[in-house]
Design a protein with these regions (language model features):
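Residue-level signal for pocket-adjacent positions within structured domains
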Residues: 61, 84-86, 185, 362
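Amphipathic alpha-helical interaction segments
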Residues: 53, 59, 78, 82, ...
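Conserved N-terminal glycine-rich FAD pyrophosphate-binding loop of Rossmann-like flavoproteins
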Residues: 39-77, 238-255
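Generic hydrophobic, aliphatic-rich segments that mediate packing or membrane embedding
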Residues: 62-75, 87-90, 117-120, 133
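Alpha-helical interaction segments
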Residues: 60, 64, 81, 107-110
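Flavin (primarily FAD) cofactor-binding/catalytic cores of flavoenzymes
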Residues: 1-40, 103-425
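A conserved beta-strand/loop capping segment in the N-terminal third of enzymes
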Residues: 70-104
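Tryptophan-centered motif/residue detector
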Residues: 44-46, 91-94, 123, 336-337
Length: 425
């Protein structure tokens, strides 16, 4: 692979680009990495990305940076040199260069605000001279020798980029809502209004979603004057992310993942990653008696006086209708958001590779050791869908160094058991 095109200039893109930079400097083979980003490096951690106001704190330790866990297995005899070179782009190196390392230690190693995390990613991008294209991806097609990606700049002019490999990152659009209604805000609208202190007056508010996106929105809402704040999610309760050594070790070191059954893997992901709030957010909400949980899936939205009526469905009881003055769609990113960019031929090839119509479960089960869809002639890396097949740390910030090792590995099939397709039942 000579060229790898990455969609989205977030932590995963920076991890792969930095590792490629290090490998090349050490005289080892690595592809040229080109990154396409609509906003800015680290844009989803800034207000411009629509997923945050930039003022809330990172849900994980910043020491899990673009090189973590600094345990490269890329090239026998050269791994220590790779690890040492990657440490030049670590979170602590960023703090040392800016003269804030001692203060950060003395304050107890706090998680940084989102905007500070974005600054760290931008610092890495400058240090490695990131090959960055600012623009919006319009379409993706597969040609004779790889991928062809159409990118529109700020003035609407299209540029065609070609690459041997393609990696998709990011959560998709932050402007999506469950339904078109004046009292239902997308997460982008919510953060834009919250940043201007212009949220609509509301006595009864609801946050739809049970993951970290919803947790951050709740963390903001409790700072506003509201009588009740309801959290709507299909889970029986709002779970807290496990932060013990045993749970964290599965995220940092996915080597034991292949030995777990499918049910055990799903249990780990459900209990520790999907639909959970961070410990810090849960502690902030603990003493606020305005916050309550409503179990169910939203199946209908309708007008109601000056607000919105939301119908919740549960398997074991009749539908329930609740009314709110304001609701925020914080269900988070859409795992398959990128499929709408693929042309019909690329879609057909992808369906042939996964063995049927494109569903999340089929794509998840097709992810090989190198975090790419198995069976495609041109590599398509989907780390955000790699949790079930390869390990729970790949879709998030838990093992970015391992992620870059696998994507850039010259022997993607060397871990035979991890590369075969899973049978999902």
């Amino acid at each position: 692979m000579e060229t790898l095109l990455v969609v989205g200039a977030g932590p995963k893109a920076l991890a792969v680009a930095a590792k490629s930079h290090v490998l090349r400097n050490l005289g080892l083979p690595a592809p040229r990495v080109v990154v396409v980003e609509a906003h800015a490096v680290g844009g989803n951690w800034l207000p411009s990305g629509g997923w945050t106001d930039g003022q809330h704190r990172l849900g994980t330790s910043p020491e899990k940076d673009i090189g973590f866990p600094y345990r490269s297995t890329w090239a026998r005899g050269r791994n220590q040199a790779i690890n040492a070179a990657m440490k030049e782009f670590s979170w602590t190196s960023f703090l040392v260069e800016h003269g804030t390392f001692a203060e950060w230690i003395d304050r107890g190693r706090p998680s940084p605000h989102h905007h500070t995390w974005a600054r760290y990613l931008q610092w890495v991008a400058r240090a490695i001279d990131l090959d960055l294209v600012i623009g919006t991806v319009r379409s993706i097609r597969q040609g004779d020798n790889g991928w062809s990606v159409s990118v529109a700049d700020a003035e609407g002019r299209d540029t065609e980029l070609t690459a041997d490999g393609l990696m998709i990152t990011g959560p998709g659009r932050s402007t999506r809502t469950l339904a078109e209604h004046s009292r239902i805000l997308s997460i982008a609208e919510f953060w834009e209004l919250a940043g201007r202190r212009a949220l609509p007056a509301a006595s009864r508010a609801a946050v739809i979603g049970g993951g970290e996106t919803a947790g951050s929105a709740l963390d903001e809402l409790v700072r506003h004057e509201m009588l009740t704040i309801s959290v709507i999610s299909p889970m029986a309760t709002i779970y807290t992310r496990g932060e013990s050594y045993f749970e964290n070790a599965l995220f940092s070191d996915p080597s034991k993942w292949a030995a777990l059954s499918m049910q055990e893997r799903r249990d780990v992901i459900r209990r520790t990653d999907r639909g959970v709030f961070s410990v810090r957010v849960q502690e902030n909400l603990l003493g606020d008696n305005r916050v309550h949980h409503l179990q169910g899936r939203v199946v209908r939205v309708a007008d109601h006086a000056d607000g919105v009526a939301v119908t919740l469905r549960n398997e074991l009881r009749a539908d329930q209708v609740h009314t709110f003055d304001l609701a925020i769609d914080a269900t988070g990113g859409q795992p398959l958001w990128f499929l709408e960019l693929f042309d019909s031929y690329a879609t057909d090839l992808l369906e042939l590779a996964v063995g049927g119509p494109l569903t999340q479960s089929r794509l998840e089960s097709s992810i090989g050791y190198d975090l790419a869809v198995s069976g495609l002639a041109s590599k398509l890396y989907l780390p955000n869908l790699a949790a079930l097949a390869q390990g729970p740390g790949f879709p998030n910030l838990s093992c970015l160094g391992e992620l870059s090792d696998r994507v850039l590995s010259p022997e993607p099939a060397r871990a035979g058991s991890g590369a075969r397709r899973l049978v999902v039942r």
